[in-house]
Amino acid sequence: MTEEIRESREEELERIRQLEASPEYQEKLRILREKMKINIRWKMYKIALVLGTVMLFAMFKFVGFVIAAVLGFIYVYPVYKRKQELFREKKENNEVLYVERFLSPIVKEIFPTGEMKVTPDFLLDPVKKVCPSSTNYRGNTELSLHDSSELSVMNLYAYHVVESTDSKGRTSRKEVTDFYGQVFRMQFPKSFAGHIRVIPTERTAILKREVQDYPGKQKNELKIDTEDIRHNEHYNIFCTDEFMARRFLNPTVLDWFDKNISESQTAIYIEDSTMYISRYTGYQLFPVPGTVEAIDQLSLVEEYKKLRAEIDLIESFTEIFKA
């Protein structure tokens, strides 16, 4: 890290510290924490009330129902009333509260035009080009920097369901993960003629046979190899313009792919002036605190440090593709 970047980081951190120390922000944080905690409690109380009512009714019939109603009024109604006071007519779950109300303002301290939102606006068709074949795709939490390359990243979970029947004729359903990681979208510095897909492939240890769940060669595509033997073993390249593809796959880009082989499955799709990159990391960025204890520990400074580290990683990961 250069001295200039280090000074910039220190200035950012100091702005965050001053913001967190202000009485206005402390009040906002107190309300946000209370909203998130009451969302958790309300969900738990509703489940407990339903289960308790069923059990009491089964044991005591009408009397059990009356007991459940009394307990609900004593313990559940105050929580419901406070929830109505906090949210009024506006319904916000903890994902919205954490991502859009808590993290997004931090992003704006780093990138004034940046934002975070719960629902991504990535188009599904190009996303499928950089992910294994699947039937269900769930994207969440998009970070958009709105910088010169229009860099955005979202979490993605893709899966399919397998049904099986045992010897007794009982059917079970199992959810199989196809992809769990991040998808990046950015503007490619130059317009790309046609398109190129670079996707990972695995080989069995004995037969060296390709085992690939990513979409194979499509209509009008060519499959090409490079002079990098290691790259050919781990990646398949499909394109519609071989000249443009080979110009893109210069030694720097091939080295970047080789580096990422050991870290995660990485795929690229470029069409016209837009690039999509996927990383199968096995985790999601910006997970929402799921317990009351974690919510109580929310700190603007600490969340800034984690967010800044993620943004630095994202920028470093995509740096070679920027103009």
Please provide the spans of the model-predicted regions.
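Transmembrane-cytosolic junction motif
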Residues: 36-40, 73-102
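Cytosolic juxtamembrane N-terminal segments of multi-pass membrane proteins
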Residues: 1-42
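Transmembrane alpha-helical segments and their cytosolic interface motifs
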Residues: 37-55
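Alpha-helix boundary/N-cap detector
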Residues: 3-7, 20, 94, 98, ...
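Hydrophobic alpha-helical transmembrane segments
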Residues: 45, 56-71
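Intrinsically disordered, low-complexity coil segments
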Residues: 82-94, 112, 163-174
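Charged, low-complexity intrinsically disordered regions
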Residues: 100, 104, 108-162, 170-323
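Alpha-helical transmembrane segments
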Residues: 51-54, 70-77
